[in-house]
């Protein structure tokens, strides 16, 4: 028996040696970018465990292996970009080659298979839906049309804060504010399911955030069932879908009635989508699921990024009292004597704009942006990038790169004074909203929902930390999800400086 087992064990040993030699030869001949050591099955995942947040861990790995780094995250061949030079190569020089998005397990279920603007594959449909977003949904004119919505919702918040006699949960209040602004912009003033919808959006964001084990091994369908994630995602999706079906139906009925009665009304975002859907000249007809996907994109991207940016801006100003004092002095000088603050004057707040630029540099809402996907095999900087490789651009690391930023980890708004660096995608050392064809189309809408609330909160209130916490003691810990938020909610004590004029409140 032992004799018979010898040839078998020898054969197995030979096969194993052959596979190892073959693997070694493949690795030797491979022109993949450098990266850390990979293990069977899990690939490079062990390098991301126990090293803090993903964007931090990836920056640390890039310091060892370079700004163009290859990882194997489970089944996903992954390219990590950590310098402005490599970001330019991916999002400008070879932008078309990397114009696809990676649709993950969770977003595939929640967002109708990636039919929205954020995840749709590059092609005729994506070009059409982006054009609709840029020219119709999120144009400067459309953003301006929601000025009254912003004014009323911010006034409601200011009134609520003024009524508080002690500390407030600033984080929760800002999240509620941005949700309410976007809900009114999307659905109009009356939406019976608004609170249920917003609660489901929050649950969906929590489920989709961060690294997901089932998403790292997409071929192992059993994992999706074992973890229970698929069932949870499908439940949230189905409940959101039910609400969106009713909203779209109501808007279509309103549109038909207005045509019959020749009534005119101010369009909300769903109205715009319904009107565009009726256009028979569209190159790619829009089904209701396309409309739903775009609506969800606006909520998931718009609310999270705006509230996160306000929260970090306030945190940084509290930690840097000189910045807070200077920003408040500017706001109160510009708005001095005004009975009603209007958005035109926001453009005069040059220092506040520097504060927000610096906030976005240090706290890009999505630090790894939305992953791209290589459409065809190509060569970058002498390395071969296989087709279907997922690309993560570490905007957080690039925004702190000492090659581009002196004292990169410090909050210094003045660094932007007198320079033309902006977040519109042409300065690759500063890409909080991405760049190239897939740059965020909602920047105008998002920044309007940041600048106006922050300016008014600085105008109406003085802010201090509770419980005798000193500025230098304020924790700035992060938590990683769809966006990177504060790990702990920001609690503050407001003191009314300028009372709210009755004309700006909405009863």
Swiss-Prot record:
**Purpose of the protein:** Cytochrome P450 involved in the biosynthesis of etoposide, a chemotherapeutic compound of the topoisomerase inhibitor family. Catalyzes the conversion of deoxypodophyllotoxin to desmethyl-deoxypodophyllotoxin.
PROSITE patterns xrefs: CYTOCHROME_P450
Q: Name one GO molecular function term.
A: oxidoreductase activity, acting on paired donors, with incorporation or reduction of molecular oxygen
Entry's InterPro entries? CYP450_71D, Cyt_P450, Cyt_P450_CS, Cyt_P450_E_grp-I, Cyt_P450_sf
Its protein name is: Desmethyl-deoxy-podophyllotoxin synthase
Q: How is it used?
A: Combinatorially expression of Sinopodophyllum hexandrum (mayapple) genes of the podophyllotoxin pathway (e.g. DIR, PLR, SDH, CYP719A23, OMT3, CYP71CU1, OMT1, 2-ODD, CYP71BE54 and CYP82D61) in Nicotiana benthamiana (tobacco) results in the production of the chemotherapeutic compound etoposide.
What Gene3D superfamilies does UniProt report for this protein, alphabetically?
Cytochrome P450
- Pfam families for this protein: p450
Q: Which family does it belong to?
A: Belongs to the cytochrome P450 family.
Which chemical reaction does it catalyze? Answer: (-)-deoxypodophyllotoxin + reduced [NADPH--hemoprotein reductase] + O2 = (-)-4'-desmethyl-deoxypodophyllotoxin + formaldehyde + oxidized [NADPH--hemoprotein reductase] + H2O + H(+)
Q: Which cofactor does it need?
A: heme
Keywords (A to Z) from UniProt: Heme, Iron, Membrane, Metal-binding, Monooxygenase, Oxidoreductase, Transmembrane, Transmembrane helix
Mention one GO biological process in which this protein takes part, according to its record: phenylpropanoid biosynthetic process
Protein localization: Membrane
Q: In which tissues is it expressed?
A: Rhizome-specific expression.
Disulfide partners: none
Q: Which residues bind heme?
A: 440
Q: Which residues cross the membrane?
A: 1-21
Report one GO cellular component: membrane
Topology within the bilayer: Single-pass membrane protein
Q: Which gene is the coding source of this polypeptide chain?
A: CYP71BE54
Instruction: Enumerate the CDD domains for this protein.
Output: CYP71-like
Q: In which pathway does it act?
A: Aromatic compound metabolism; phenylpropanoid biosynthesis
């Amino acid at each position: 028996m032992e004799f018979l087992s010898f040839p078998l064990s020898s054969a197995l040993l030979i096969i194993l040696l052959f596979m190892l030699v073959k693997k070694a030869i493949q690795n030797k001949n491979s022109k993949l970018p450098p990266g850390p050591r990979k293990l069977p099955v899990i690939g490079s995942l062990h390098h991301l465990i126990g090293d803090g947040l993903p964007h931090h861990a990836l920056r640390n790995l890039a310091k060892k292996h370079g700004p163009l780094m290859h990882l194997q995250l489970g089944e996903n061949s992954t390219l990590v970009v950590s310098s402005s030079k490599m970001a330019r190569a991916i999002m400008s020089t070879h932008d078309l080659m990397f114009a696809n998005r990676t649709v993950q397990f969770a977003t595939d279920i929640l967002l109708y298979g990636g039919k929205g603007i954020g995840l749709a594959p590059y092609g005729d449909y994506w070009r059409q839906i982006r054009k609709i977003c840029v020219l119709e949904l999120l144009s400067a004119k459309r953003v301006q049309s929601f000025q009254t919505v912003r004014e009323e919702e911010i006034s409601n918040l200011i009134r609520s804060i003024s009524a508080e006699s002690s500390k407030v949960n600033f984080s929760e209040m800002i999240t509620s504010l941005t949700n309410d602004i976007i809900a009114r912009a999307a659905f109009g003033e009356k939406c019976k399911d608004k609170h249920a919808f917003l609660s489901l959006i929050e649950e969906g964001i929590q489920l989709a955030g961060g690294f997901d084990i089932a998403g790292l091994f997409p071929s192992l369908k059993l994992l999706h069932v074992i973890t229970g994630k698929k069932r949870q995602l499908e439940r949230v999706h189905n409940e959101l879908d039910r609400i969106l079906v009713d909203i779209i139906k109501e808007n279509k009925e309103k549109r038909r009635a207005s045509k019959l009665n020749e009534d005119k009304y101010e369009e909300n975002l769903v109205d715009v989508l319904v009107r565009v859907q009726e256009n028979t000249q569209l190159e790619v007809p829009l089904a209701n699921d396309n409309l739903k996907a775009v609506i969800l994109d606006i909520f998931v991207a718009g609310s999270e990024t705006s509230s996160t940016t306000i929260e970090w801006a306030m945190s940084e100003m509290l930690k840097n009292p000189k910045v807070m004092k200077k920003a408040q002095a500017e706001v109160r000088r510009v708005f001095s004597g005004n009975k009603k603050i209007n958005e035109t004057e926001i453009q005069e707040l040059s220092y506040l704009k520097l504060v927000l630029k610096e906030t976005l540099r240090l706290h890009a809402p999505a630090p790894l942006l939305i992953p791209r996907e290589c459409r065809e095999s190509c060569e970058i900087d002498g390395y071969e990038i296989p087709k279907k490789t997922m690309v993560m651009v570490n905007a957080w690391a690039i925004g702190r790169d000492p090659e581009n930023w002196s004292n990169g980890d410090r909050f210094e708004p003045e660094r932007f004074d007198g320079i033309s660096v902006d977040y519109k995608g042409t300065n690759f050392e500063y890409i909080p909203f991405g760049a190239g064809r897939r740059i965020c189309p909602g920047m105008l809408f998002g920044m309007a929902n940041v600048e106006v609330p922050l300016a008014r909160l600085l105008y109406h209130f003085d802010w201090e930390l509770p419980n005798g916490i000193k500025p230098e003691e304020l924790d700035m810990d992060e938590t990683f999800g769809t966006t990177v938020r504060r790990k702990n909610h920001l609690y503050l004590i407001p003191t009314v400086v300028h009372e709210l004029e009755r004309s700006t409140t909405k009863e």
